[in-house]
Amino acid sequence: MNNAAILVPGSLESVLDRHIDLIWQVDLRGPLLLMKHALPHLQKAGGGDFINVSSVAAVFPGPGPYENVTRGDGAFYGMVKAGLERASQGLARELQSENIKVNVLSPQGRIKTPGNIWADNDPDNPSLEFEAADEMGKATVWVCEQSIEFTGNILYDQDLCKEKGL
């Protein structure tokens, strides 16, 4: 399960070049390298699962027009999460014949991580609510229990838990 990520705040005009490089390195390149280096172990074991953690930011905000626009509120994070989703589906297609599943699981709320706790302390955003991490855990177990045909999916934890009664 690939779960490491960072958020780079700022607008296109204000973001530092090194921060763009950093979010690519951590949020997209990191999971791909982890998968690359774990792959021989899954092949040796005769199969397994990769679950890449994405975010609803991969599809947010959707088509315009937009109201109440806040500049610099996640375009870069959404960009790398969308890239991770696309890469995951491509790799699912490549690895299915080796009995290796690749799926994407996104929390639908904010999980209580150090980064989200920091955001919760932001005076501009004082009332963030957190999602219990157990829904991600239950959804992860369910995904891993599925047959090899269940690969290349982009899933959302709360929807999956509700749909499957987890």
Feature annotation, model-predicted:
Residues 104-105, 122-166:
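C-terminal helical subdomain
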Residues 10, 59-63, 100, 104-120:
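Short beta-loop-alpha junction of Rossmann-like oxidoreductase domains
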Residues 6-8, 13-33, 51, 77, ...:
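Catalytic Tyr-X3-Lys loop
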Residues 1, 34-38, 42, 87-88, ...:
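Hydrophobic positions on the long internal alpha-helix
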